[in-house]
Amino acid sequence: MAAAAAQGGRSGGIGGCIGAGGASNCGTGSGRSGLLDKWKIDDKPVKIDKWDGSAVKNSLDDSAKKVLLEKYKYVENFGLIDGRLTICTISCFFAIVALIWDYMHPFPESKPVLALCVISYFVMMGILTIYTSYKEKSIFLVAHRKDPTGMDPDDIWQLSSSLKRFDDKYTLKLTFISGRTKQQREAEFTKSIAKFFDHSGTLVMDAYEPEISRLHDSLAIERKIK
């Protein structure tokens, strides 16, 4: 009898998932599943401390980055980051050489090499400061759009942002550089971060993604017209 009851329960469960004409009506949340398939970021909602400015900016930056890479299928270029890492690596090399040389040739014999390494290290730090200030600026993403025909160079899309300390105004700038003409165009918005986060500090992509898409589409339309 227990087996029959179990079988009946299973049959009832299956029957509850089948509607008229044998169509499946299981409540699997198909609408939400479709949304999750489209936006991977929604698999793990971004939740931060709303009073932590760095966390707020980083979460908005990362989410904007995901929109360009996942929705528009652009390919990230790591050239800017590689440049910074190269400078840092060279700086660390001078520091390591100074450490090893001083171990092998105790001071004051190591004095000339130590002086050279120290000077070189600070020169590289100066170069790094110039690089981050004038080359990287506030850019956190460089992405390439491949030409479908393979005839023209890649179009370049750049994302940069700013959020001043103790300010709730977040600015996101999207820059488009034509691979064919090298012309550059920009679009940006400045919004209160309260528009994009709920009371618990969770990023609301339904409010944030359309703003990014509007920026992108405004530049994409200009590109097609020209």
From Swiss-Prot:
Main location: endoplasmic reticulum
Cytoplasmic side, ranges: 2-86, 133-226
Family membership noted in the UniProt record: Belongs to the SPCS2 family.
Modified residues (N6-acetyllysine): K169, K191
Source species of the chain: Pongo abelii
Protein's UniProt keywords contain Translocase: no
Membrane topology reported for the UniProt record: Multi-pass membrane protein
Underlying gene: SPCS2
PTM annotation (N-acetylalanine): residues: A2
Coiled-coil segments on the chain, per record: none
Protein name: Signal peptidase complex subunit 2
Pfam families, per database record: SPC25 (PF06703)
Residues spanning the membrane: 87-107, 112-132
Function, as annotated: Component of the signal peptidase complex (SPC) which catalyzes the cleavage of N-terminal signal sequences from nascent proteins as they are translocated into the lumen of the endoplasmic reticulum. Enhances the enzymatic activity of SPC and facilitates the interactions between different components of the translocation site.
Membrane side Lumenal: residue ranges: 108-111
Location of the protein in the cell: Endoplasmic reticulum membrane
Keyword Acetylation: yes
GO cellular component terms listed in the entry, alphabetical order: signal peptidase complex
